[in-house]
Amino acid sequence: MSKDPGRILIFDTTLRDGEQSPGASLNLEEKLAIAHQLARLGVDVIEAGFPFASPGDFKAVNKISNDVGKENGPIICGLARASKGDIKACYEAVSPAPKKRIHTFIATSDIHLKHKLKKSRKDVLQIVPEMVNYAKTLVEDIEFSCEDASRSDPDFLYEVIQLAISAGATTINIPDTVGFTTPSEFGKLISDINKNVPNIDEAVISVHGHNDLGLAVANFLEAVKNGARQLECTINGIGERAGNASLEELVMALHVRKSFFNSFFKRNPDSPTPLTAIRTEEITKTSRLVSNLTGMTVQPNKAIVGANAFAHESGIHQDGVLKNRLTYEIIDAKTVGLSDNKISLGKLSGRSAVRARLEEMGYDLSREDLNDAFARFKDLADRKREITDRDLEAIVSEQVQLPEAKFQLCLVQVSCGNASKPTATITLLNTADNTEDTAVSVGTGPVDAVCEALNKLAKVPNELIEFSVKSVTEGIDALGEVTIRIRRDNKIYSGHSADTDVVVAAANAYVNALNRLVFSEKKNSIHPQFDNLENSNKTFLSNPAN
């Protein structure tokens, strides 16, 4: 019986593979905010995390399963290595979701078997059916991945896939784990799997790929032509190393070139039926949310969601667009949720008006979060005459982004000029013992002085590796968004903040980054690809939900 869904399923792994980007560590509230937005976006599957990694990861997957998992919503999925410890933890984490999936995997390439797993092909042929079968006793929906499939021996790969399907796998994922393959090679690999695995019709073929050679999206589209029906991707293409295949690029390629791809689904070229279930008008908002919460700025020239994606500098191009946008634009900006509309909110606007506008924009805030957001709105309205949707997005994103706060900024005072040394006075609250302390520092500029003072107070050794600031909207009174990235022990942590005063924004962003660093070191998680299987057969936690 064919498992072909008749369209493309979008499997979002922003919260799992995307979070493995250096500096992109997210707290529980941030993960929930992104998961809710992914559900509004219309993804079919949310890979919420790797539950066995740490108690924090388990709790996040469990909370998303409980709060975002709905009968009419996305499947909530957790990752598990091919071992009982991982699979059991994964099942317990996703169990509250009405639609749940266990995604288990093992490497199939000889280089991974020899150097990472220290196992033989014979070992893998024994492990795969045993672990898939075990997972099947817990949930019906099982995805199995052949890690590093693109560098695996094809005949061995076919054998592993056949065993996984026979044991109960309903989705077979073919990863290009190191971004090694080219479109023609990847398309042929999917085609050959269809031809050489006798029971392949009993499972959906999925693909997962990294962008090390800049070919991930092209590889996926070639895979679609050859029978892949699930695409594993991330918002803004974030992920380890050069990132993953970009969700927005894949979705819009299938949207804009639907007449081309329809034939691969046995449809009439002019069929109006969408190839995905994505609500494209939610793309821009989702991109900005992920960018703000992870601290990973989207490059200006990035397709679909970059600041310049719909900008025209050339006079010839500008003239053509003014006469007819189709002359130089293949996508209407409104299709991905871009709008120049401004809202008439100001300092006289009340809580109800702000709440109503946020609800129209798709934000569902708790009473406490709404009160905090409204307080920030009123503070901004006293300094800025006209409040735009982008201003509200910045306010809400920062509100959600606040990590577990060991440190809270109480005072920022800076003096600088061309005839004086930049000097910063900072007061910081340490919530661990509820004490305030003040420090004064000089620096090469006001931001450097602020960071030096904060380092004196926090006493958390780190290296500042990136500082960036951009304007949220136009005008002299615009909010300035600051992103700061710091490094400690080869790990990167990001902080983000927005304020009409960029020095205050920089101070808040630096404190956020410090709080992330402290929170991450408490978390003590493991990586699914770099820890051996033996570790996962140990007892996970006596009470993993705590």
UniProtKB/Swiss-Prot annotation:
SMART domains: LeuA_dimer (SM00917). Pathway: Amino-acid biosynthesis; L-leucine biosynthesis; L-leucine from 3-methyl-2-oxobutanoate: step 1/4. GO terms for biological process: L-leucine biosynthetic process. It comes from the Bacteria. It is an enzyme of class 2 (transferase). Its main location: cytoplasm. It catalyses: 3-methyl-2-oxobutanoate + acetyl-CoA + H2O = (2S)-2-isopropylmalate + CoA + H(+). Mn(2+) binds at residues 17, 208, 210, 244. Its EC number is 2.3.3.13. Residues 8-271 form the Pyruvate carboxyltransferase domain. PROSITE patterns: AIPM_HOMOCIT_SYNTH_1, AIPM_HOMOCIT_SYNTH_2, PYR_CT. Its cofactor is Mn(2+). It is found in: Cytoplasm. One of its GO terms (molecular function) is 2-isopropylmalate synthase activity. GO terms for cellular component: cytoplasm. Keywords: Amino-acid biosynthesis, Branched-chain amino acid biosynthesis, Cytoplasm, Leucine biosynthesis, Manganese, Metal-binding, Transferase. Residues 408-546 are annotated as: Regulatory domain. Catalyzes the condensation of the acetyl group of acetyl-CoA with 3-methyl-2-oxobutanoate (2-ketoisovalerate) to form 3-carboxy-3-hydroxy-4-methylpentanoate (2-isopropylmalate). HAMAP family: LeuA_type1. Belongs to the alpha-IPM synthase/homocitrate synthase family. LeuA type 1 subfamily. Homodimer. NCBIfam families: leuA_bact, PRK00915.1-3. This is 2-isopropylmalate synthase. It comes from Prochlorococcus marinus (strain MIT 9312). The gene is leuA.
